[in-house]
Amino acid sequence: MKENVFDVLIYLFENYLDRDTEQAPDPDEMRTELLEAGFPQREINRAFDWLETLGAQQPMRAASLPAFRIFSSEELAKLDVECRGFLMFLEQNGILTAASREVVIDRLMALNEEIISLENLKWVVLMVLFSQPSEEVAFARMENLVYESFPGYIH
């Protein structure tokens, strides 16, 4: 079984994080369940570190002026034209702000994947929006894009 950090994150999100419960899940129980499900300890630890860093980031504030994003060479190598276009689409349609886009890019780069797929990008956007207070509307809109078929978008 060749699982990576992203697979662990998706498992956690679908089974624990996206629930309407008041009580937070026990991290030790989650780790045990992940091990029993066959995920490697190293990837579990990396996923928890990824989530901890996401949770430690300050709540996002919308920029007062529109911003033009220039991607670094490392970002260009990991995020193909389709991914960059989708980020722009989300920002232009009010799902992401310039600030939330930066958090998404930071979390994508932290995955240590050679290339980020559009599917992985969508899930990371969903996780970032879920983690931020007062982003319920954007989260709901993004959730529809992840869970439902989505017609093509303009590049």
From Swiss-Prot:
What family does the Swiss-Prot or TrEMBL record give for this protein? Belongs to the Smg family.
To which species is this protein native? Methylococcus capsulatus (strain ATCC 33009 / NCIMB 11132 / Bath)
Cysteines joined through disulfide linkages? none
Q: Which InterPro entries match?
A: Smg (IPR007456)
- Look up the domain of life of the source: Bacteria
Its protein name is: Protein Smg homolog
